[in-house]
């Protein structure tokens, strides 16, 4: 009997394509890149080149647990939110948690009126890029060409 392939697998509150390999399917989760996906597979002993939809339910549950609790499996330097300002713990955020944490960080900078916060609130570049010629907004000032004189050379 041929094994059924699941078209959609839910891991980390994200619907993943069951036809892709495990590593590349995991990389579709926001906050999990390809290197992190391979590290998770290596840590759990799952073949990263296996098709995700063919994995048994217990391995999918292991993957879901590992994605949600990566801070327990990986060293601190591998995580995407070290020394969280609110809790002081090393975390690895995924999905909407990652987006909301970044938004909260920017809002905090704006509230504290730090240099970066002021630049964010003004809609200017934040990381030291040049702004003389690039990053302009508003209508472009076009150059109009003079009308040619009639009968001229």
Curated annotation (Swiss-Prot):
Annotated keywords: Ribonucleoprotein, Ribosomal protein, RNA-binding, rRNA-binding
Superkingdom in the source lineage: Archaea
A Pfam family of this chain: Ribosomal_S13
Ribosomal protein is among the record's keywords: yes
Cross-referenced InterPro entries: Rbsml_uS13_C, Ribosomal_uS13, Ribosomal_uS13-like_H2TH, Ribosomal_uS13_archaeal, Ribosomal_uS13_CS
GO biological process: translation
GO CC terms of this entry: cytosol; small ribosomal subunit
Tagged with keyword Ion transport: no
Gene3D superfamilies, A to Z: 1.10.8.50, 30s ribosomal protein s13, domain 2
GO molecular function terms noted in the UniProt entry: rRNA binding; structural constituent of ribosome
NCBIfam families: PRK04053.1 (NF003140), uS13_arch (TIGR03629)
Family under the similarity heading: Belongs to the universal ribosomal protein uS13 family.
PANTHER family per UniProt: 30S RIBOSOMAL PROTEIN S13/40S RIBOSOMAL PROTEIN S18 (PTHR10871), SMALL RIBOSOMAL SUBUNIT PROTEIN US13 (PTHR10871:SF3)
Subunit structure: Part of the 30S ribosomal subunit. Forms a loose heterodimer with protein S19. Forms two bridges to the 50S subunit in the 70S ribosome.
Main function: Located at the top of the head of the 30S subunit, it contacts several helices of the 16S rRNA. In the 70S ribosome it contacts the 23S rRNA (bridge B1a) and protein L5 of the 50S subunit (bridge B1b), connecting the 2 subunits; these bridges are implicated in subunit movement.
Record-given protein name: Small ribosomal subunit protein uS13
Species classification: Archaea, Thermoproteota, Thermoprotei, Thermoproteales, Thermoproteaceae
Gene: rps13
């Amino acid at each position: 009997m041929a094994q059924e392939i699941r078209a959609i697998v839910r891991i980390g509150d994200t619907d993943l394509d069951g036809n892709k390999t495990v590593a590349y399917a995991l990389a579709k989760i926001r906050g999990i890149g390809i290197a992190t996906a391979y590290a998770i597979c290596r840590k759990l002993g799952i073949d990263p080149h296996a098709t995700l939809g063919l994995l048994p339910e217990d391995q999918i549950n292991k993957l879901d647990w590992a994605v949600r609790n990566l801070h327990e499996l990986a060293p601190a330097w591998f995580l995407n939110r070290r020394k969280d300002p609110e809790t002081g713990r090393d975390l690895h955020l995924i999905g909407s948690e990652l987006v909301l944490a970044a938004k909260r960080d920017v809002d905090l900078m704006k509230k504290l009126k730090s240099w970066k916060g002021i630049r964010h609130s003004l809609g200017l570049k934040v990381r030291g890029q040049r702004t003389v010629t690039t990053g302009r907004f508003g209508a472009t000032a076009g150059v109009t060409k003079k009308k040619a004189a009639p009968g001229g050379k």
